[in-house]
């Protein structure tokens, strides 16, 4: 706690024939972060043909999965599925090397891919045919108004026939121009249909070029003449039957597709996951160095996992390996990847720390402090027992439902579980149960403080809490800089604010505790003097401007904690409005029916659920902001290098390595 996981540097050199199995072992363990071996002028490893095939097959499998998904029945969804997701079953695969894995994938694809592609091709063909038939049916419905046999609407050897739609207001001018350019050798038939006119143009074949150009000028929408003979109205039933036949054929093909999808979908997902992990492994090959017979790698490993890693390497290589384990040197400290280490009950708060950035290896991990203060700030801003209870119930359900997955939702729900506990406690202290609902119902509620009527007191509390929060940050910054040997920064950047905050605190308490003025003035003066000296040393010529800017920056950061009061007041205010609206309609009756009670209950339930959601969102964001901007700004850079293990991502597969 407060310190990241101890990390050591592990260097391994062994025979090239062990490369694939050793990489797979490290990948499955998922406890080592691979780094590029820092040796210039030596040959780097590259993916061989099997790794390249893995990349290609990963893409192929992904496309096949997308195809068969369309034929599977829709998955269960909804709130229940979100809260209690089904755990995916894992299937074991005996890993005998990438060559054998590629052979297994090729064998599977050789069986499954042709069947899937065949169904895909058939579905595409039938969809195109149905679409074409529907277009023809639409054309027949338009042409039926002409009452002309369909064969007469097709061109002849000496005649050109164009049938289509044109804007109704343009049709007169179009007909005139047609007669002019064809010198009277043209026949037109017109049928007005709302805003469009259906037009048949018959001309000599030799004039067709000029006719078509003119039709295009007027925005003529050509209608393709369907197959068949006879009147359009007589052909329509035949086309409807043809469409039904094709749709029945399509359903049969889709049914076949569903059978294939149900047979192969899980296998496709399984093999894709295997290929994805091989693909990821290939991305790290350039980190390795090699000769004709050997290869070497460099890894960062948590100290607690080193023994397990070394034992595994020796087992896989039959002891034919050079392994060096050592602590990072002073020069390497900046480059050491950081893995946060906290007790299980607060480890989920690491997610919030990592969102900002991890500490450097020689810095303090703020997660233990953030776990308490974030939850407290959230509770202070939401500050209602019922809201906290509602949030707690939802969070508890999500924690239970995602407990086996240990995913981001599970971590977030555990954070909200803490936050809801603080919200309920502070809700009791402030006597807030859906705002003042119990007070309006005539129930006497005990409370230490009323947010609405004692807003000024709540503001003073918020500023006092903020001062304490900033003080903690400056103390931590002082400790980190002093410990890391940067004593000047500790004395000139953190210590001045420590004295200034103590001085402000003594001044605030002086009237109650009888502290002499000279005491707080002396402490404040020392802090101010150190602050000015620090500004002069650090900023030289810009010291005057930056002294004013930085001092008022501190004041701004301090006053920013007033948002604790503002959001607590907003929560109470919104709840009060909901309660007043419900109270206004409560007595409404229509005859003997107490309609107002029903409406009032709906307003109370819906309104307070909305209030919980909107105010919880505000509390979440602003509690984060107070840490990321105000608190972390006092001591924490978040510029560390996050530990990113070389780890397999497995949801449906499990590897058994044959060494």
Curated annotation (Swiss-Prot):
Pfam families: V_ATPase_I. Keywords: Cell membrane, Hydrogen ion transport, Ion transport, Membrane, Transmembrane, Transmembrane helix, Transport. One of its GO terms (molecular function) is proton-transporting ATPase activity, rotational mechanism. Has multiple subunits with at least A(3), B(3), C, D, E, F, H, I and proteolipid K(x). The keyword Transferase does not apply. It is a multi-pass membrane protein. This is A-type ATP synthase subunit I. One of its GO terms (biological process) is vacuolar acidification. GO terms for cellular component: plasma membrane; proton-transporting V-type ATPase, V0 domain; vacuolar proton-transporting V-type ATPase complex.
């Amino acid at each position: 706690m407060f310190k990241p996981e101890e990390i050591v540097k592990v260097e391994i050199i062994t025979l090239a024939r062990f490369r694939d199995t050793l990489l797979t072992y490290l990948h499955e363990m998922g406890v080592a972060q691979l780094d590029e071996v820092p040796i210039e002028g030596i040959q780097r490893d590259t993916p061989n043909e099997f790794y390249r095939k893995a990349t290609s097959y990963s893409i192929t499998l992904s496309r096949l999965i997308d195809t068969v998904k369309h034929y599977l029945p829709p998955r269960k969804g909804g709130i229940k599925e979100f809260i209690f997701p089904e755990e995916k079953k894992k299937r074991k695969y005996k890993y005998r090397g990438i060559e054998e894995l590629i052979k297994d994938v090729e064998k599977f694809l050789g069986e499954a891919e042709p069947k899937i592609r065949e169904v895909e091709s058939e579905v595409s063909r039938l969809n195109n045919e149905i679409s074409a038939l529907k277009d023809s049916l639409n054309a027949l419905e338009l042409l039926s108004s002409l009452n002309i046999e369909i064969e007469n609407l097709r061109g002849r050897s000496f005649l050109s026939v164009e049938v289509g739609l044109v804007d109704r207001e343009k049709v007169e001018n179009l007909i005139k121009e047609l007669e002019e350019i064809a010198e009277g050798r043209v026949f037109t038939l017109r049928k007005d249909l709302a805003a469009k006119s259906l037009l048949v143009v018959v001309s000599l074949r030799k004039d067709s070029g000029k006719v078509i150009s003119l039709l295009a000028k007027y925005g003529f929408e050509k209608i393709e003449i369907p197959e068949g003979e006879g009147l359009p109205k007589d052909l329509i039933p035949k086309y409807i039957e043809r469409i039904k036949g094709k749709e029945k054929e399509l359903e049969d093909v889709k049914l076949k597709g569903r059978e294939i999808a149900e047979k192969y979908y899980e296998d496709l997902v399984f093999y894709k996951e295997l290929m994805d992990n091989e693909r990821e492994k290939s991305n790290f090959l350039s980190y390795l160095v090699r000769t004709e017979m050997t290869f070497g790698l460099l890894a960062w490993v948590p100290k607690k996992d080193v023994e397990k890693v070394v034992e595994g390497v020796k087992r896989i290589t039959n002891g034919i390996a050079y392994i060096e384990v050592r602590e990072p040197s002073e020069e390497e400290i900046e480059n050491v990847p950081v893995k946060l280490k906290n007790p299980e009950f607060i480890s989920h708060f690491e997610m919030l720390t990592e969102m900002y950035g991890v500490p450097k290896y020689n810095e303090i991990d703020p997660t233990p402090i953030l776990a308490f203060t974030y939850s407290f700030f959230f509770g202070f801003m939401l500050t209602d027992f019922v809201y906290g209870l509602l949030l707690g119930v939802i969070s508890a359900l999500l924690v239970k439902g995602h407990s086996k997955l240990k995913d981001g939702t599970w971590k977030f729900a555990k954070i909200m579980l803490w936050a809801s506990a603080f919200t309920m406690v502070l809700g009791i202290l402030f006597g807030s149960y859906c705002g003042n609902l119990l007070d309006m119902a005539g129930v006497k509620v005990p409370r230490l403080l009323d947010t609405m009527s004692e807003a000024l007191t709540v503001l003073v509390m918020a500023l006092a809490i903020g001062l304490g929060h900033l003080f903690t940050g400056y103390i931590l910054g002082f400790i980190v800089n002093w410990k890391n040997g940067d004593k000047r920064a500790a004395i000139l950047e953190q210590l001045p604010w420590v004295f200034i905050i103590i001085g402000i605190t003594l001044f605030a308490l002086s009237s109650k505790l009888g502290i002499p003025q000279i005491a707080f003035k002396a402490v404040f003066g020392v802090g101010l003097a150190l602050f000015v000296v620090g500004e002069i040393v650090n900023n030289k010529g810009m010291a005057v401007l930056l002294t004013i800017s930085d001092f008022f920056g501190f004041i701004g950061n301090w006053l920013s904690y007033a948002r604790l009061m503002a959001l607590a007041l907003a929560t109470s205010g919104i709840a009060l409005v909901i309660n007043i609206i419900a109270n206004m309609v409560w007595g409404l009756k229509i005859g003997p029916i107490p309609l107002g009670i029903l409406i009032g209950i709906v307003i109370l339930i819906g309104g307070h659920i909305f209030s919980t959601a909107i105010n919880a969102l505000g509390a979440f964001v602003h509690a984060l902001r107070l840490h990321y901007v105000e608190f972390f700004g006092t001591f924490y850079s978040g510029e560390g290098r996050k530990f990113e293990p070389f780890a397999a991502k497995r949801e449906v597969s499990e590897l058994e390595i044959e060494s």
